[in-house]
Structures are given as C-alpha cells and as structure tokens.
Amino acid sequence: MRTVQRLCVLVVSLLLLSSTGSRAQLPANELEGTWKMVSQKLVYPDSVVDRSGEWGANYKILNSTHFAWGRETKDGETVLAGGGRYEYYPERNVYIEHIQYHSDPAMSGATLRFTARVEGDTWYHIGKVGNFKLREVWKRVDPEKVRAQLRGDTVSTDSRTPE
C-alpha cells in the first residue's frame, strides 16, 4: 500500500510539472512529451553494464523548460525520482539536465550533459555521469493510446505502464 501511495504522489507531481501554462512556456521542441525508457547501459572503460531489465515503470516527462522522471523497482518496493530544468540544442545534438531535485541528494544541483538525437519516436542520449557514461534509449508514449486505455478501449498487460 505504501508503494502505491508513493507512486501516486510521484505521478501527480510529474503531471503537475508537465502541465503547460501558455504564457510560461517556450516554443515546442521535439522532446516535449512523455517518454518510456527501453534501454539503459552504464559504459565503463573496461565493461558495459546493461540495466535495462532491472526496473519496472520508468518514465520521463518534458515540457518546454523542465523535465521530471520517475521509476520503480519491478517489485514496486522502491521509487526513484528527479527533475529540474533542461536545455536542448538539436542542431548540435546536445541535451543538458540541470537537476534541481533527486531522490539521491548527492545528485541535486548536478548538471549532466548528453549527446542526444531523436529519430522518429525514439530518443537516444549518452553522457558522462561520475566514472561511467550513461547510455539511454527512450520511446515516446503515444498519448492517443493512453487515452484509449483510460477509456477502456484497449487492454494493457500492466496497468502501471500504459504503453
């Protein structure tokens, strides 16, 4: 029950952060929207650790100025979250996160710089975090599919992960 409460608080926080106010927003960019992680690898000088299968639900939501992400362990016992401001320069393939809050306090205040590109509905980025490079692949969540699921038009195999 406690995990469900934490996940609900996380989802509400992410939704509030991702909601748009017309006067406060910059022009749209291709990163705006909801993304679901499909792959995460930690690339060390002598090895690669694939963490893709270690997590349950794992989403990142971006509006024109801010991002928020949240994920939980497969068993639902642990929820991690973070967010802050971001910069995106598609002409230079650069994505920068300015982390303002994080479930790991040591990450709060950090700035992470990534080489990034979007191809169709897939977002690739890689950047240095500590002593490794973080390589992630995200798929855009189709809002129409989510709306259909909420209306009951389709059946999901996992109600926590709409896509």
Q: Where do the model's predicted regions map?
A:
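Bacterial N-terminal signal peptides that target proteins for export
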Residues: 1-9
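Bacterial N-terminal signal peptides
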Residues: 8-18
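Lipid interaction determinants
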Residues: 19-81, 94-163
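Extracellular/luminal ectodomains and secreted, surface-exposed scaffolds of diverse proteins
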Residues: 84-88
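Short, charged helix-to-loop "capping" segments that act as catalytic/coupling loops
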Residues: 89-93
